[in-house]
């Protein structure tokens, strides 16, 4: 199993389901930071301003929001720099998708040296979000903070639960977009002024 989700799509009885964390299970006593995936904004029809989504996340109970797109921009820049190095093996394979990395590890280990040795955007976002929260709120310790990735991808949930390259993930929870969407849409409608 590489956590690709194909079995979920193919099961004629719809007996298989992706396992995400539930929003309700996130510890309310902790400082909760939402990490919306860049694709999250595409779920909202006629969204003119992403600030409605960002404010909505705060309104449903998150203490802060850190956009994964910020981390993706940094990873993109480091990837450009990495690609300029002389002794890299081609083809170069991005490490952002846990399904691709797991497939290579299990079935094509001879390609492992081609995977870019770089932290995926969700890991960098989780790390940066925690560091920024502790800088803003010096009373917080790392364990006082819950990093919650809002994801379209069931593989990311497995990836976070199983750790990043054998290490604990910087992300604590992975909540499905659909779980957050319905909570958020009601709050966003209230925030829109006629």
Ranges and model annotations:
Residues 2-22:
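Iron-sulfur cluster-binding cysteine motifs and their immediate structural context
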Residues 19-194:
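Iron-sulfur-associated redox domains of electron-transfer enzymes in respiratory
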């Amino acid at each position: 199993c590489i956590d690709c989700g194909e079995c979920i799509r193919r099961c004629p009885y719809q007996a298989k389901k992706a396992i995400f964390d539930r929003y309700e299970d996130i510890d309310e006593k902790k400082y909760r930071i939402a990490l919306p995936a860049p694709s999250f904004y595409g779920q909202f029809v006629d969204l003119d301003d992403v600030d409605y989504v960002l404010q909505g996340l705060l309104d449903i109970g998150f203490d802060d929001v850190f956009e994964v797109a910020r981390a993706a921009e940094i990873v993109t820049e480091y990837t450009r720099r990495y690609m300029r190095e002389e002794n890299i093996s081609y083809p170069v394979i991005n490490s952002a998708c846990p399904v691709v990395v797991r497939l290579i590890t299990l079935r094509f280990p001879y390609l492992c040296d081609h995977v870019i040795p770089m932290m995926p955007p969700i890991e960098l976002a989780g790390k940066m979000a925690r560091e920024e929260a502790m800088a803003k709120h010096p009373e917080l310790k790392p364990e006082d903070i819950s990093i919650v990735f809002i994801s379209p991808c069931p593989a990311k949930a497995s990836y976070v639960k199983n750790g990043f390259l054998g290490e604990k993930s910087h992300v604590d929870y992975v909540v499905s977009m659909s779980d957050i969407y319905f909570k958020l849409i009601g709050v966003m409608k209230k925030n829109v002024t006629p």
